[in-house]
Amino acid sequence: MKKYVSLVLCLLLAALLFTGCAGGNGGSSGGGKTSDAAVNEALLGCFGKSADEAVKALGLKDDQKAGDYGYTLDYAWGGQTMDTNCATNSGGAGVFGYAEAQKTFENSDAGTAEIKAFVEKFTAQFNDPYAVTRYTQAEKTKETYDAAQLETYLKDVAGGESGSGVQFRFSLVGKNDRMSDDGDYIEVSVQNTGDGLRVKLSMEHVNR
């Protein structure tokens, strides 16, 4: 019963967000959307708005702009639960969005191929069409994303000791102006658990 009520609330929330936020913002082009993509589009529809517009679209009061207010919606994506948040932030400076997905893969070449697809699918739903660049915390450099380089990282972790890992970021660049400023990124964290490769993906967007 509790799960049923939660599902109904999530559906109502998605409908509210789609009506209040998505209108007036063009969605990504392409074929038919999955229900997950439709929910995500409703949330991302708030990102192109100013803080004042977002507060109105989210049904918030003017005095709520000073804090973090908004909605968090859990829904299934690719067999995983993703937590997506749309809210005003930093004293009403803009709209903040965050999404996360996590999954464990086999510690093998087949596993690394599946991880590449997992990363690219996650990235594509936020920026379509999209291009990504890779940031590494150690090098402090920015370079064009190369799927072969990602595979090299994954194989290094797979061949390492249990507990070893790697973490890096993709900045989002593309025609979708809601997701094209420098503050947008997807972070990839891969850890060798000994039993497999645990991959955690997160997306963050701030529209100021």
Predicted regions: what is each one?
Residues 1-7:
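Positively charged n-region of N-terminal signal peptides that target proteins for export
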Residues 59, 101-106, 144, 148-208:
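An acidic-aromatic pocket/loop used at catalytic or ligand-binding sites
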Residues 22-25:
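Bacterial signal peptide processing site
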Residues 77-168:
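Long, charged/polar, surface-exposed segments that mediate recognition or autoinhibition
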Residues 40, 51-58, 112-119, 123:
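Extracytoplasmic/secreted envelope proteins and their assembly/folding machinery
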Residues 16-20:
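C-terminal motif of bacterial Sec signal peptides marking the signal peptidase cleavage site
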Residues 45-49:
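A glycine-biased structural micro-motif
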Residues 37-44, 106-109:
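Short, recurring structural edge motifs at helix starts
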